[in-house]
Amino acid sequence: MAYGVKIAKGDAYKRAARKRRHIRVRKHLSGSPERPRLVVTRSNRHIVAQVIDDIAGHTLASASTLDTSIRGGEGDKSAQAQQVGALVAERAKAAGVEAVVFDRGGNQYAGRIAALADAAREAGLKF
C-alpha cells in the first residue's frame, strides 16, 4: 500500500508515516456546507484549526496560537490548544456552523490534538 511517500529513517520516517496517514484519511473525509471539515495543523511551536467547506473551497472560521488573544497567554502548549479549540468553535458558531467533520491531519489523537477537540466539543461544536 504505497501512497507515494518514500520510507526514510528517524524523524524523516515519522514525517513520511504522518503524510501517508493523512493521505489515507483524506480519501474518505470531505467537508460540505452542512458539515464542514475541522482541520488541525500542528507544528512544534504552534497549532492551527480551520473550518473548511471543501465544496466551495472556502475557510469559514479559523483560530491559531498566533492570534493576539492567545499569543501572549499563559500555560503550556496543551492549554493553548484548548484555547484555540474554544476560539474556533466560537467563530464557527458565529458563522452558522453547528456540526463538523474532524480532520486530525494524520496526527495521533492525543495531547494537543485531543485537547483542542475536547475544548471545541465543550464550546458547542458537534463531531
Swiss-Prot record:
Record-linked Pfam families: Ribosomal_L18p
Disulfide bridge positions per record: none
Quaternary structure, from the entry: Part of the 50S ribosomal subunit; part of the 5S rRNA/L5/L18/L25 subcomplex. Contacts the 5S and 23S rRNAs.
Coiled coil region boundaries: none
Gene Ontology molecular function: any one: 5S rRNA binding
Keywords: Ribonucleoprotein, Ribosomal protein, RNA-binding, rRNA-binding
Gene Ontology CC annotation, any one: cytosolic large ribosomal subunit
Presence of keyword Transmembrane: no
UniProt protein name: Large ribosomal subunit protein uL18
Function as written in the Swiss-Prot or TrEMBL entry: This is one of the proteins that bind and probably mediate the attachment of the 5S RNA into the large ribosomal subunit, where it forms part of the central protuberance.
NCBIfam families: L18_bact
Recorded family membership: Belongs to the universal ribosomal protein uL18 family.
GO biological process, one term: translation
